A protein has these predicted regions:
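S-adenosylmethionine/decaboxylated-SAM
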Residues: 2-176
Length: 176
C-alpha cells in the first residue's frame, strides 16, 4: 500500500525478475494495475549440489519438464493480458534480458536466483534501468535458505558502494 500510494502510478512500468509460477505476478497486476508488467525467468532446472533444495534445482524439487510446464502455466495465466500488451514474458536469464533491454522501470521486483553473485548483478542492472524515484524490492531479505544468505550479502555490498536509501520490513527492501 505504501509503495502504491507514494511511488507507483497506473502508468507505471514494472519488471519482475524470477516469475516461477506467476502467483506474485498476478498480485502485482491486481494491486498496482501497471501500464506494463514484464516478467523475466529462464524456467531452467539448474544442476549442482547448491541448487538441490531450491525451487529450480534439477536434483531437488524440479526437473526441466516441470520448469517447461511452469512457463506454459504462466503464459496461460496471463493470456488475456499478453493479448492486451499489458504483460510481456521473457524466457531468459535476467542478465540476458538486461543486455537487450531499453526500458526504464518504476518498480523492479527481484526474486530470481538468490545466490550472492546473481543478486548483486540483478541489483547492479536494476539500478541502471530504474526511473528517478523508482523502487527496487528484493525477496527473502534477511531470510536464511539454500542460497547461503546471498540476498542479504548483496544488499550489504551495495549499501557500502552506492548512495541508496534502504527501507526494510516484511522481508522486502526498497532502493531509490
Amino acid at each position: 500500500k505504501l509503495i502504491k500510494e507514494h511511488f507507483i502510478g497506473e502508468n507505471s512500468q514494472i519488471l519482475e525478475i524470477g516469475t516461477h509460477r506467476g502467483n506474485f505476478s498476478k498480485q502485482i497486476l491486481e494491486n498496482f494495475n501497471p501500464k506494463k508488467l514484464i516478467l523475466v525467468d529462464p524456467w531452467i532446472a539448474f544442476e549442482g549440489k547448491i541448487y538441490k533444495n531450491s525451487w529450480y534445482g534439477r536434483s531437488g524439487h524440479s526437473n526441466q519438464e516441470i520448469q517447461n510446464n511452469y512457463y506454459i502455466e504462466v503464459n496461460q495465466l496471463f493470456e488475456k493480458e499478453i493479448i492486451e500488451n499489458k504483460v510481456e514474458i521473457f524466457r531468459k536469464t535476467s542478465d540476458e534480458f538486461f543486455n537487450k533491454n531499453l526500458n526504464k522501470f518504476d518498480l523492479i521486483y527481484i526474486d530470481g536466483n538468490h545466490l550472492f553473485e546473481f543478486v548483486r548483478r540483478d541489483i547492479d542492472n536494476s539500478l541502471k534501468f530504474l526511473k528517478k524515484n523508482g523502487v527496487i524490492i528484493l525477496d527473502d531479505y534477511k531470510l536464511k535458505g539454500w542460497w547461503d544468505d546471498g540476498v542479504t550479502k548483496a544488499i550489504k555490498f551495495h549499501e557500502k558502494e552506492k548512495n541508496i536509501k534502504i527501507i526494510t520490513g516484511h522481508n522486502l527492501l526498497n532502493y531509490h
